[in-house]
Amino acid sequence: MPIGVPKVPFRSPGEGDTSWVDIYNRLYRERLFFLGQEVDTDISNQLISLMIYLSIEKDTKDLYLFINSPGGWVISGMAIYDTMQFVRPDVQTICMGLAASIASFILVGGAITKRIAFPHARVMIHQPASSFYEAQTGEFILEAEELLKLRETITRVYVQRTGKPIWVVSEDMERDVFMSATEAQAHGIVDLVAVQ
């Protein structure tokens, strides 16, 4: 039996009455965000708007992005990554569960020294893929060229943010590479593994 989204009490500063808000809105007010689904334009736009709004509201207090995602759309994930680099507050990324595919790209985009993985978290990197198989030859070639550009961009970001040589990152992206939290730390995707 689904319980829906829990409601929690919240009192705005300066207000006497407590109101009940859903737990996500309460956590947003504490600058905590959750990427707990496949990355698509809806969740991307929601996270981007929250980061921008809260960075305008207070640009010196860190934002926290908790990640448990199988990945998803590359362009939507890159939009989240770019916003994380654009906003003034540091964005701390915390992997709990799984950060796979474009979600691992978002994870590595957190502020250097502020990227964390829970002890039993898993991280997976690979090259971008497409499901555009039924296209005409010309469209297929254009799609392949775009995928190659995306792969080069993603590889360059991983190299820059992990400190690993380009040949290591390129080789790892050839297939699905799953890592434990400590392996992700050794790979430079996260800086710390949370203690139990």
Swiss-Prot record:
PROSITE patterns: CLP_PROTEASE_HIS (PS00382). It comes from the Eukaryota. The keyword Protein transport does not apply. It is found in: Plastid, Chloroplast stroma. It is an enzyme of class 3 (hydrolase). Its EC number is 3.4.21.92. Keywords: Chloroplast, Hydrolase, Plastid, Protease, Serine protease. One of its GO terms (molecular function) is ATP-dependent peptidase activity. InterPro entries: ClpP (IPR001907), ClpP/crotonase-like_dom_sf (IPR029045), ClpP/TepA (IPR023562), ClpP_His_AS (IPR033135). It catalyses: Hydrolysis of proteins to small peptides in the presence of ATP and magnesium. alpha-casein is the usual test substrate. In the absence of ATP, only oligopeptides shorter than five residues are hydrolyzed (such as succinyl-Leu-Tyr-|-NHMec, and Leu-Tyr-Leu-|-Tyr-Trp, in which cleavage of the -Tyr-|-Leu- and -Tyr-|-Trp bonds also occurs). GO terms for cellular component: chloroplast stroma; endopeptidase Clp complex. It holds the Pfam family CLP_protease. Its main location: plastid. GO terms for biological process: protein quality control for misfolded or incompletely synthesized proteins. The active site is at residues 101, 126. Belongs to the peptidase S14 family. Component of the chloroplastic Clp protease core complex. Cleaves peptides in various proteins in a process that requires ATP hydrolysis. Has a chymotrypsin-like activity. Plays a major role in the degradation of misfolded proteins. This is ATP-dependent Clp protease proteolytic subunit. The gene is clpP.
